[in-house]
UniProtKB/Swiss-Prot annotation:
Compartment(s) where it occurs, according to its Swiss-Prot or TrEMBL record: Plastid, Chloroplast thylakoid membrane
This protein's UniProt keywords: Chloroplast, Cytochrome c-type biogenesis, Membrane, Plastid, Thylakoid, Transmembrane, Transmembrane helix
Main localization, broad class: plastid
InterPro entries named in the record: Cyt_c_assembly (IPR002541), Cyt_c_biogenesis_CcsA (IPR017562), Cyt_c_biogenesis_CcsA/CcmC (IPR045062)
GO MF entries: heme binding
Protein name: Cytochrome c biogenesis protein CcsA
High-level lineage: Eukaryota, Viridiplantae, Streptophyta, Embryophyta, Tracheophyta
Transmembrane intervals: 9-29, 44-64, 71-91, 101-121, 143-163, 217-237, 244-264, 279-299
Cellular component GO terms held in the UniProt record: chloroplast thylakoid membrane; plasma membrane
Gene: ccsA
Domain of life: Eukaryota
Its membrane topology: Multi-pass membrane protein
Length: 317
């Protein structure tokens, strides 16, 4: 009872802060000179991260299982993963721009997770027999962490495309201060460009930085996704006697894996190391962004297959 009350309080605190952060970001979008508001929003994100962490911990204790058994619990974990990835670059020198790009999505996922829209599917704390396995934490946590990292990396790729094809105007709030931070990284994919001048120096440097970090974040997410798929296959064999059954969730997870494998191949192929390869890879990652949401959220609308226990009650089989 105490933990349920604490969980309820943490949920409302998180949602209240998220609503305030949404208002702050709207003000910053309209009046981009107000930089102090951005600092306040970042501190608010830290508070919500700790609230979500406490929410996961109290829910784990009250339900007596790791909170990854349905769509509601997994979305809470996804929002926590998003927030974790968001705050890491905030405390790292020269990478705060990553937080600026990721923060809107982190705020959205946290707001949706704590809004109560998914509470209808979380009606019982009793696990179905298939979920009573030690593989639950390994498989689902790796998949969710993979989704979060791939989504964040894809957002950086989307930003790369926007900056590449946008020729005029400020890139982000704060004007050139955002771009004139030190750009220190180990490789230069754009050194063969023929239009290197003072006018496009910061723009080119920023594009390189986006490409550098999108590749690394997506690589990390791809590793998590691969581990999640393999552990899920082993778990499926133990539970149902088959490593793979091609149900909707498994099929779309495989499609997601293929898409980001193409991204990594395009990005690392020595014969394709050029500006165009970075753009092509970013386009692939942008497509992957949509596919991840179809795999994670869209498939649950169907409510069929071995993963239907995580879908909405109105569509569950």
């Amino acid at each position: 009872m105490i933990f349920s009350t604490l969980e309820h309080i943490l949920t409302h605190i998180s949602l209240s802060i998220i609503l305030i952060l949404m208002t702050i970001h709207l003000i910053i979008f309209l009046v981009d000179e107000i930089r102090k508001l951005y600092d306040s929003s970042e501190k608010g994100m830290l508070v919500t991260f700790f609230c979500i962490t406490g929410l996961l911990a109290t829910h784990w204790i009250s339900s007596e299982h790791f909170p990854l058994s349905d769509l509601y619990e997994s979305f809470i974990f996804l929002s926590w993963s998003f927030a974790l990835i968001h705050i890491i670059p905030y405390f790292t020198k020269n990478t705060k721009f990553l937080s600026k790009i990721i923060s809107p999505s982190a705020i959205f996922t946290q707001g949706f997770a704590t809004s109560g829209l998914l509470t209808e599917i979380h009606q019982s704390s009793i696990l179905v027999p298939a979920l009573k396995s030690e593989w639950l934490i390994m498989h689902v946590s790796m998949m969710i962490l993979g989704y979060a990292a791939l989504l964040c990396g894809s957002l950086l790729s989307v930003a790369l495309l926007v900056i590449t094809f946008r020729k005029n105007g400020k890139l982000f709030s704060g004007g050139n201060d955002f771009l004139t931070e030190s750009f220190l990284f180990g490789e230069n994919l754009f050194q063969k460009t023929s239009f290197f001048s003072a006018k496009n120096y910061y723009r080119t440097q920023f594009i390189q930085q986006l490409d550098f970090w999108s590749y690394r974040v997506i690589s990390l997410g791809f590793l998590f996704l691969t581990i999640g798929i393999l552990s899920g296959a082993v778990w499926a064999n133990e539970a149902w006697g088959s490593y793979w059954s091609w149900d909707p969730k498994e099929t779309w997870a495989f499609i997601t894996w293929i898409v980001f494998a193409i991204f990594l191949h395009t990005r690392t192929n020595l014969n394709l190391q050029s500006v165009n390869s970075a753009i092509v890879a970013s386009i692939v990652a942008s497509i992957g962004f949509l596919i991840i949401w179809i795999c994670y959220f869209g498939v649950n609308l169907v409510g069929i297959g071995l993963h239907s226990y995580g879908s909405f009650p109105s569509t569950s089989s």
